[in-house]
Amino acid sequence: MSASDNNNSLEKNFAPLKNDRLLRALRFEPIDTTPVWMMRQAGRYLPEYKATRAEAGDFMSLCKDTARATEVTLQPLRRYDLDAAILFSDILTIPDAMGLGLYFEAGEGPKFKHPIRQQADLDRLPVLDVNDSLDYVMRAVTSIRTALNGQVPLFGFSGSPWTLATYMIEGGSSKDYRYTKGFLYSNPEFLHQLLDKLATSVIDYLDAQVVAGAQILQIFDSWGGALGHRQFVDFSHAYNKRIVAELKVRHPEIPVVLFTKGGGLWLDIQADSEADALGLDWTMPIDRARQVLTESQRQLTKQHKKLHSSKAIQGNLDPATLYGSPATIRAEVNAMLDSAYANGEKTGYVANLGHGITQWVNPDNAKVFIDAVHDYKI
């Protein structure tokens, strides 16, 4: 059975998709209006999310409770006219499954009890059987996809190897990546060993999400922007490129979005991958990104490299815009969409925030954002 036949067989388990606007935009097909969703759209800005999380007890218990993970995924779709759902989970599920002891402290974000700081730590990391150690994620994907009943497509996701490695080595969030960058310059082979292990796990993890029901995949390279140019190529992009290439072998029909926060400088590098779309944060104008990607395609052709398909764009409203008035939000959305379609394009774009929606946003302002996107005339 070919990969395409296998994907078609998997789809028979679920209701037909009713709203494929986002998928059509990623394929550069005609769309009636701009598709939109929000990173972290199931989150703490919603009172119903807070209530469900309180019932679960803590964040990871919520992630591992199939019924509640399904519920919080669906909550924003009940409020808003969104064009996609995204699995409710966390980017740190892989290192948690590797035994690093993920926990959360109030006001301090995620932490690991057992950070990776020496070769013995690295050698102890298991080769994951994702369908065993992360079976709760796959159960949630299937449950959510079934509950959606074809309403909108479902995103699965993972953190990138580089981003996961920073958390695993630092033991949590970091402002300067002291230990991770220390290895990068003093013992790069150690870091490459870890990134290689993580890339293998990310491939298997995202593959399993597709089998469970995910229709689109996103790789969150949240801290790729902390790297220098050459370091980004070697320690982030190379592994992301490998992951996407293998996913395209296994599931050629599944779109993959690659989002590197702070990665606008490296769109030409990311163009040399099989990702269907690149996510932008708010620091890179969309019209300029389109121009960079068009020129990158020309250069790749001249260099006789494999010419990957044109890249759609996703993004990139500053999340802080949602603190503004409805009039301000609409004006900023219109400016963003003017930029997205400035060069005469009519598709190949998905509206989103430039990073996750924050817990302090008024839910009514999120609706203003979503409705303003749909109201814009392409």
UniProtKB/Swiss-Prot annotation:
What biological-process GO terms show up in the record? protoporphyrinogen IX biosynthetic process from glutamate
Q: Where is this site: Transition state stabilizer?
A: 90
Question: Where does the chain bind substrate?
Answer: 40-44, 90, 167, 222, 355
Q: Which domain of life is it from?
A: Bacteria
- State one molecular function term (GO): uroporphyrinogen decarboxylase activity
Name residues in a coiled coil.
Answer: none
Which reaction is this enzyme known to catalyze?
uroporphyrinogen III + 4 H(+) = coproporphyrinogen III + 4 CO2
Predominant localisation class: cytoplasm
Q: Where in the cell is it found?
A: Cytoplasm
Q: Which GO terms describe its cellular component?
A: cytosol
Gene3D superfamilies attached to this UniProt entry: 3.20.20.210
* CDD domains named in the record: URO-D (cd00717)
What does the record give as EC number?
Answer: 4.1.1.37
This protein's pathway reads: Porphyrin-containing compound metabolism; protoporphyrin-IX biosynthesis; coproporphyrinogen-III from 5-aminolevulinate: step 4/4
Keyword annotations from UniProtKB, A to Z? Cytoplasm, Decarboxylase, Lyase, Porphyrin biosynthesis
What job does the chain carry out?
A: Catalyzes the decarboxylation of four acetate groups of uroporphyrinogen-III to yield coproporphyrinogen-III.
What quaternary arrangement does the UniProt entry report?
Homodimer.
Q: Which family does it belong to?
A: Belongs to the uroporphyrinogen decarboxylase family.
| Name the UniProt record assigns to this protein | Uroporphyrinogen decarboxylase
Q: Which organism is it from?
A: Psychrobacter arcticus (strain DSM 17307 / VKM B-2377 / 273-4)
